[in-house]
Amino acid sequence: MAEITASLVKELRERTGAGMMECKKALVEANGDIELAIENMRKSGAIKAAKKAGNVAADGVIKTKIEGNYGVILEVNCQTDFVAKDGGFQAFADKVLDAAFAGKITDVEALKAQFEEERVALVAKIGENINIRRIASLEGDVLASYLHGARIGVLVAAKNADEELVKQLAMHVAASKPEFVKPEDVSADVVEKEYQVQLDIAMQSGKPKEIAEKMVEGRMKKFTGEVSLTGQPFVMDPSKTVAQLLKEHNADVTNFIRFEVGEGIQKVETDFAAEVAAMSRQS
């Protein structure tokens, strides 16, 4: 068995663009023969997949699964809406979801490692980068999920509530994007940041600091209500807040998770005209 040195792995990475573990594995299988390793990687699609890895995967699907008191929510990304609807891509996402659920896996890196070979093969087949982006779980007395076109997914956990009510709350979370369950849950750093923004706005209007501070106190109460689930008007009946709805049912929401495909991912927009102009200048 030939020794697989760090310099050999480095050379293969530079020549193929594949990941370190992928290169090391290929070299082990080729008994240290770098040319054979490259040939094998070409056959398996690993090199093609590595070239796709730099492409921004900002489309994709959200998947959820609930059984009893345990639920998981998963985001798997691809590059286009067309591939997001592809049967092979959907099957891959379902398989990842089932494995995460069965093993109660919430470490996305562990999940990525488990499915790396299948991901690479799928990238080579469909020609787009694919990324298992995030996974989260939720436990509670009553759980419900809601998917909006597979692009927005929500899990809600509640106590003393029937499943239909919790389902409606999941739909509310999908539509209204709360960040916290209750106003008192809004973190101190978020409150402080918003307070300073509102104080600056009030001071710019020429108000004395004492009056500006009193104005901001009222605005902060409104702000914490707007970003919390229980403080928001219920989307199906805006005449009452979610807190009032829960009180009517003697119910309580303990937690929720909301995923939206691609949120926070910077998608590169190509200016075709500028690209053509740049190419013409180079010619």
Swiss-Prot record:
<dbReference type="InterPro" id="IPR018101">
    <property type="entry name" value="Transl_elong_Ts_CS"/>
</dbReference>
<keyword id="KW-0648">Protein biosynthesis</keyword>
<keyword id="KW-0963">Cytoplasm</keyword>
<dbReference type="InterPro" id="IPR014039">
    <property type="entry name" value="Transl_elong_EFTs/EF1B_dimer"/>
</dbReference>
<dbReference type="InterPro" id="IPR009060">
    <property type="entry name" value="UBA-like_sf"/>
</dbReference>
<protein>
    <recommendedName>
        <fullName>Elongation factor Ts</fullName>
    </recommendedName>
</protein>
<keyword id="KW-0251">Elongation factor</keyword>
<dbReference type="InterPro" id="IPR036402">
    <property type="entry name" value="EF-Ts_dimer_sf"/>
</dbReference>
<feature type="region of interest" description="Involved in Mg(2+) ion dislocation from EF-Tu">
    <location>
        <begin position="80"/>
        <end position="83"/>
    </location>
</feature>
<dbReference type="InterPro" id="IPR001816">
    <property type="entry name" value="Transl_elong_EFTs/EF1B"/>
</dbReference>
<dbReference type="GO" id="GO:0003746">
    <property type="term" value="F:translation elongation factor activity"/>
</dbReference>
<comment type="similarity">
    <text>Belongs to the EF-Ts family.</text>
</comment>
<dbReference type="GO" id="GO:0005737">
    <property type="term" value="C:cytoplasm"/>
</dbReference>
<comment type="function">
    <text>Associates with the EF-Tu.GDP complex and induces the exchange of GDP to GTP. It remains bound to the aminoacyl-tRNA.EF-Tu.GTP complex up to the GTP hydrolysis stage on the ribosome.</text>
</comment>
<dbReference type="Pfam" id="PF00889">
    <property type="entry name" value="EF_TS"/>
</dbReference>
